[in-house]
Amino acid sequence: GSEMCIRDSTTTLLTRELRQEVEKIFVGNEEYGNFIITVLSFGFKYGIPSDADLVFDVRFLPNPYYEQALRPLTGNDRSIQEYVMKNGDGRRFLDKLEDLMQFLIPRYLDEGKNSLVIGIGCTGGKHRSVTITNGLYARLKKLPYTVRMEHRDIEKDARTKGK
């Protein structure tokens, strides 16, 4: 059918919206089951995700890109996580972000929102944003909501200019 021809930037948006609708049907028994939080890492050089409700810039954290041995790795690797989190700012940022989310989420629920997309961005979307996205996901999944994680730009080659 014609729906198979969709090949633009809306594809991931449509996929996520479809997944959220399906999850509402199957997870709807839980009290907050139909409120879906997506924590999304991305690279600013590839554009801010159009469906992000909140966007946080983590380019202030130590950048492993400049360490030759670390460059090919991602924020899913322990050595990258240790590098990004080494000076304590990453943990403090996660503490503040978790506190902010615990304040905001009940208020978004009161407004009738059924999903929240939190974008975490660094330059390329491979190291710092992935590390912080993983950290925020680990904290938010303890809350009584459906929480999803997505790393949009993790596979993009750091040497590639543009998309």
Task: Describe these PLM feature segments.
Residues 19-42:
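Extended, charged alpha/beta regions that create polyanion-binding interfaces
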Residues 13-22, 46-48:
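Conserved GTPase G-domain signal focused on the G5
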Residues 1-6:
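Short, small-residue-biased leader/transition segments that mark boundaries at the very start
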Residues 9-12, 25-31, 90-93:
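N-terminal start-of-chain detector that recognizes signal peptides
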Residues 7-17, 120:
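Phosphate-binding beta-loop-alpha motif at adenosine-nucleotide cofactor sites
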Residues 34-163:
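P-loop NTP-binding site
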